[in-house]
């Protein structure tokens, strides 16, 4: 069962009425394990940056963390799927901070079959609440026999997936698609990890035709990493070394405890 808290206390019907009827907020999601989060600082930076853009208001990390700790303490949990949503409201600075807690989730392990579609999110740099197109394209991809949608911009460049970023691997270099997309926290953690490991990386335009064997590819988001099996029926390599390399890169980035002080 999902539990929702608003500004550090259990949410009321009135607290949730606005977010239920509008889509003018923004959010971040992550997996909490033993009261620690990979890339917690990146999630806090995301929330503050989006609040400044959408609402012309800073969102102090201490406020977010106080609300998160209060929610975790209220249900006495150390592991959860967490969503923090920021919406206009009666809270400090005219903003309400909603913390939603659900059961912890693990990534699917089966490689994904993707169906490409020409689509680019509005205000792509912000993780905003206008998610209908993402899940509608995902639904259509599944109806067509794929597992998810791969977004390609009007110029024919691969940019991102429905709720994930992606990278390519040729055995020596990780390639990150260049384009107007939401830059994910897991993507940034992996980039830092590959740098720490000395793995070569590049960011450049990628076209769907590149996504086939002998190239391998993976999807990543806050839930984890997942290999990509095919795009539009064209198989990619399933390099058995890539999942281990991704895990090694992530392992260089220590989780951050939610009870530690934040700046």
Located regions from the model:
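Helix-start/capping segments and mature chain N-termini
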Residues: 1-70, 87, 91-263
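Ordered, amphipathic secondary-structure segments that act as subunit-interaction surfaces
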Residues: 77-86
């Amino acid at each position: 069962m999902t539990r929702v808290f608003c500004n550090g206390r259990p949410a009321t019907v009135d607290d949730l009425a606005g977010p239920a009827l509008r889509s003018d907020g923004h959010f971040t999601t992550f997996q909490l394990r033993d009261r620690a989060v990979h890339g917690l600082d990146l999630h806090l930076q995301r929330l503050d940056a989006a609040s400044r853009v959408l609402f012309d208001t800073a969102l102090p990390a201490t406020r977010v963390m106080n609300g998160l700790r209060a929610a975790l303490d209220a249900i006495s949990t150390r592991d959860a799927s967490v969503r923090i949503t920021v919406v206009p409201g009666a809270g400090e600075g005219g903003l309400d901070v909603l913390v939603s807690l659900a059961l912890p989730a693990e990534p699917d392990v089966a490689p994904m079959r993707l169906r490409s579609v020409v689509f680019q999110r509005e205000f792509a740099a912000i993780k905003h609440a206008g998610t209908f197109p993402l899940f509608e394209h995902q639904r259509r991809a599944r109806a067509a026999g794929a597992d998810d949608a791969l977004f390609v911009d009007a110029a024919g460049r691969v940019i991102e997936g429905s709720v994930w970023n992606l990278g390519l691997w040729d055995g020596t270099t990780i390639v990150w698609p260049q384009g107007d997309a939401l830059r994910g926290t897991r993507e940034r953690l992996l980039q830092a990890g590959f740098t720490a490991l000395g793995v070569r990386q590049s960011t450049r335009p990628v076209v769907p035709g590149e996504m086939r064997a002998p190239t391998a590819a993976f999807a990543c988001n806050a839930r984890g990493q997942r290999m990509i099996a095919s795009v539009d029926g064209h198989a990619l390599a399933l390099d058995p070394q890539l999942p281990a390399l991704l895990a090694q890169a992530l392992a260089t980035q220590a989780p951050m405890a939610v009870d530690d002080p934040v700046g």
